[in-house]
Amino acid sequence: MSRVVVVGAGLGGLAAAARLAAGGHEVTVLEQAPDVGGKLAVERWRGYSFDTGPSLLTMPDVLSELFEATGGPPAGLRLERLETACRYTFGDGTVLDLPGRREEIPAALDAALGPGRGAQWADLLARAERMWHVVREPFLESPITAATLPAMVSSGVGLAEVAPWLSLRAYGARSLRDPRLVMLLDRYATYTGSDPRRAPSPLVTVPFAEQEYGSWYVPGGLGEIARAVRERAETLGARVHTGVRVARIEQADGRVRGVVTSDGERMRADVVVANADAASVYGMLDGEAPLRTRLATAAARFRVGLATPSLGGFVLLLALEGLPEELRGVHHRVLFAEDYDGEFDAIFPSLGARAVGTLGRAGGRLAGPPGGARGPSARVGVAAIGRPRPVRRWAGGQQRPGRQRQPAGAVRLRGGPQPGARCPGARFRGGRRPAAQRSAWPLPL
């Protein structure tokens, strides 16, 4: 039996804790936020509830396998498959209700966008499926190391299917000739805050997985998943502590020996599992290690520093009443801008945060079935996406008090029924910046 410290109680950390505890190890989980789940969080306000992170579950079998491996299905966690995954409204007024089952999608595309569109999308998904079978095991089900990467590309077939030299947009162009289908594919690049014209082709496996395995929701919010996994880990003997920040991961004799919290408490460990941002983890590693290890850590830290940060969208969490019946049954609604490329052009060359598009025309999302006793809650994601900016002080994080100290901004609503109307951020409970932006005070440009 080993003593294990898990740093971070996001879903990955909680799942690792549950599996390790089921294997008989002594497990302690340390989370700096007041609650577990990381981005998988639910905001509750006056009878309303909002998913503040992911709002869909794909590949539910992965979750089922976790619970089966650690004791069986949990009580009180119910998954619902969405019959309509998303309602898309394009700039030309076309409305597409995308089914939640892959076999129904071609007919829906033909009906909404015109004959032949379903065949174009089906061809794309068939290619994406072949890529999925190449990348799933090495990238999703195995540790990625220098030894495992060559195995994936050892055959010309695997390399050709992945086509890493193509962008997501270029990969899709081989199948898609309707610009609205191109928009549909491009949207999946925004899942990672990326430009589809630069994002790597393997992102095409995201729509494949979503449409092959279905779009699922958890009544009460996806945060219920984090609650259930925490309960499973604790039932198996793991100890979960929130509000505890790890300041340092100690090393000695060429291996980790434990962690030190920001309060100075030292916790010994045979193994440390880090469910945290890579840059943070490399920053936690202390210098008490052999020269070779320190050099490798420094090199890894340097490589992480060169990575391009992803982007996030400005999100409003709105408690809505009196919604039309046709909107109540739609879990997600995306409103595409008339010039979708214009959004990406405005975002990526800029060095500063800037608004892109408007509420009436920009990409947005209305998410959430009835979430509270007083009516449905909704999350509207506005295409107001900003590039990272220099900061003068880091404070707070995903669920820390720092987010409350952000100066209230204003969103101008153009093209709506009230021209010139302003929505000060301080007046909307739940109005959010992306997590990375909420954790810093920006420097003036």
Language model features by range: what are they?
Residues 91-199:
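Rossmann-like flavin
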Residues 205-256, 260:
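Helical element adjacent to the flavin cofactor pocket in flavoenzyme catalytic cores
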Residues 247-365, 444:
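Mid-domain catalytic core of redox enzymes
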Residues 163-164, 175-179, 197-203, 214, ...:
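C-terminal lid/capping helical subdomain adjacent to the catalytic/cofactor pocket in oxidative enzymes
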